[in-house]
UniProtKB/Swiss-Prot annotation:
Residues modified by glycosylation: N321
Catalytic activity: K(+)(in) = K(+)(out)
Basic residues bias: start-end ranges: 794-808
Domains (record comment): The segment S4 is probably the voltage-sensor and is characterized by a series of positively charged amino acids at every third position.
Keyword set includes Ion transport: yes
Region Disordered, residue ranges: 10-66, 202-231, 557-627, 691-834, 852-889
Binding site for K(+): T504, L505, G506, Y507
General function of this protein: Voltage-gated potassium channel that plays an important role in the rapid repolarization of fast-firing brain neurons. The channel opens in response to the voltage difference across the membrane, forming a potassium-selective channel through which potassium ions pass in accordance with their electrochemical gradient. The channel displays rapid activation and inactivation kinetics. It plays a role in the regulation of the frequency, shape and duration of action potentials in Purkinje cells.
Residue spans of biased composition, Pro residues class: 24-42
Tissue specificity statement from the Swiss-Prot or TrEMBL entry: Detected on Purkinje cells in the cerebellum molecular layer (at protein level).
Residues involved in Zn(2+) binding: H159, C165, C186, C187
Oligomeric and partner information: Homotetramer. Heterotetramer with KCNC1. Interacts (via C-terminus) with HAX1; this interaction modulates channel gating. Identified in a complex with ACTR3, a subunit of the Arp2/3 complex; this interaction is indirect and depends on the presence of HAX1.
Protein name: Voltage-gated potassium channel KCNC3
Amino acid sequence: MLSSVCVWSFSGRQGTRKQHSQPAPTPQPPESSPPPLLPPPQQQCAQPGTAASPAGAPLSCGPGGRRAEPCSGLPAVAMGRHGGGGGDSGKIVINVGGVRHETYRSTLRTLPGTRLAGLTEPEAAARFDYDPGTDEFFFDRHPGVFAYVLNYYRTGKLHCPADVCGPLFEEELGFWGIDETDVEACCWMTYRQHRDAEEALDSFEAPDSSGNANANAGGAHDAGLDDEAGAGGGGLDGAGGELKRLCFQDAGGGAGGPAGGPGGAGGTWWRRWQPRVWALFEDPYSSRAARYVAFASLFFILISITTFCLETHEGFIHISNKTVTQASPIPGAPPENITNVEVETEPFLTYVEGVCVVWFTFEFLMRVTFCPDKVEFLKSSLNIIDCVAILPFYLEVGLSGLSSKAAKDVLGFLRVVRFVRILRIFKLTRHFVGLRVLGHTLRASTNEFLLLIIFLALGVLIFATMIYYAERIGADPDDILGSNHTYFKNIPIGFWWAVVTMTTLGYGDMYPKTWSGMLVGALCALAGVLTIAMPVPVIVNNFGMYYSLAMAKQKLPKKKNKHIPRPPQPGSPNYCKPDPPPPPPPHPHHGSGGISPPPPITPPSMGVTVAGAYPPGPHTHPGLLRGGAGGLGIMGLPPLPAPGEPCPLAQEEVIETNRAGNDLGVLEEGDPRPNGDPAAAALAHEDCPAIDQPAMSPEDKSPITPGSRGRYSRDRACFLVTDYAPSPDGSIRKATGAPPLPPHAGVSQAPPASCPTSTPTQQPGYPPSGRAPSPPQATPEAPAIFDVWLPPFHRSHQPPGKHQRGGRHPGVSPSPQQRACVGEPPSASHPQSLTLCISVPSSCHRLRPRETLGFPLSLPPRLATGNGGRECPRDPGLPFPSRHSSPAV
């Protein structure tokens, strides 16, 4: 059995490489040759020969945008003068980003399982971008980082460059298959500080997050959006940003509101206005109207704090004597007149405070009503402060007319609690970035504050004890307590003096009088300066880092759309310039001995185009060919381009399209309209098996390191080649257990000079109406080649705004478009054990970032890694192919 895999990686080489027309090098001897694999992209199938490439050859992207012929059944191409040796003394040339590096093969073998170690394997020329003309492997990666990676192979020590950003270095390490924990201790802080900065940057909301979310919620500009808004505001404890995200998720998901359910008119009104009103009072940078509301709130906060301070000034206080007649406690005695002294503030201050409380009450009620998550809202410390600062005023107004003793006690308590009003100052954090930075700095510097407190506590205890005994030296023997000549009568009193001295305040209320006490005081002052000077710079640096990051994020350019899909441009690795198809060889009955390839079949109404496919036999399951004639139909997938047209959307465009919610729908035959959720429609179709098994379940614990999380999520497999052989009855299925291929010319006994093809047998009443006829002769031993487009693999969904670092790796899960209907075996006598090989990002520790995975699509698929499952979760129901062989069923 033969299989070959054509892969289109986004990190392909930029520009056009020189095409070499030199003859193909001689393959490796049979005893050292690996299983047949696809030759490198530069390997072209010979035009003349006994068998030639099929017409309508599958479109694949080779170096420089040239089309690579999908030669199947050819042995691995031998490398040139450096790569073909196979011994440890042979040299190998690696071109990384235009910079050539030369090293020994034995050096690359020092770290087995990595990408560079794979260059020393016999089939490396087929698996990587190998140029036989220059005898070098090309990688379009960062050349500066690669120098450190290569030195790691040479010296065994991994150092981090100081001029490279940490996330970039981490991504490069993941591409080369190196664990970040191998970084040397001397460079760990340099490597870590970039990640700390990245995490700190994520703690501040992006300046366009609220604007985009409002726009996505629908009609945000009606609320007065300003395109020049700055950074979004958030609460002191970060709850504001989370509530914004919850609000926009709720609006986008169609959550119902108090006026009605999601499906009714009330729900529609709620979904439209809830995010707008919430942003109006919560995010001052979301719209121009929100700015006016923020200015009003800031004005009332300042007025309330000013009123609170003026109430204690003598100029605004009136002292009055009120006489109250009270019954005498003695029976029969006349009533007593009691004069009470009352302190009253100016009445206009009370009125001003009442107006401020009315505004705060209105603001609080609006935020509670339109909050997307009431529980999260009540957990916020700022919201608790708002509620506590409002309640005393209403209680005081309600109890002011009562004259009972209990009411007076409550009023006295409420007057004491009125100091909570001063906490409204923290509401300014919604309007000033510096105050939010201060809050982040205090939380980030908790360890430094604890260290400072411990140092001060130790110094206070030591110097308070020393000053007590130092002042006893030279004291009068008759003064036992020392109260006549010193202030330090006991050690606890010395605590206050030690704190004042170590913090260099020096109130002067206590000071030593003896020479020994003065010496202790000098030592205490010096120790205090050194103690405070050590952790303070760390705190200051944290504040500076947070503030600079906040300013940088606030000044980021406004991005309404993260990415605008556009077709690939000529010269990019995602643009195909297909060569004209070669002329068909002579008919085998005319003496050439070749095999006529079938014409390409283009299904009229399906989402997948199959180039060079063969018409199905009578036993082919209808689900296999659903949606078009003669093609391997996978529903809801983008079509392959016609010759001369650019390739489908580039990988980042596909990802951004999926993120925007523009997922491709399932297309029924003859129906160009999307049919709803691709996954639901595919699973509900009668021809589809229940393909709902994720690629890696969350409970499978893969040894993923922090450095390997989230890398290569933008990689994808562009083309996919199966190794189906048509059976004699005309159906296309895997020839499991079939004998090896006969010695074809140019396959095993001679250098590769042809591309063998095969056709199914002509059956009575075949092909069906409207399908292209098949050639009359069949060669069941030769493999049939199918090119199928698959969408990229995506990581499991996480809530928006969540940082994907820090140990939260959800695993890999197929997107809805990958839950494709392929078909079940129609009967036990005609099994269709389809096997597709696709290159996807690997999430395993110290494995190549792109591994070959097997899909037995006749059953609910589970992924089997192409590395033997050495460090990945095993599935007992599927065999694991060896690393250097094609997957087997």
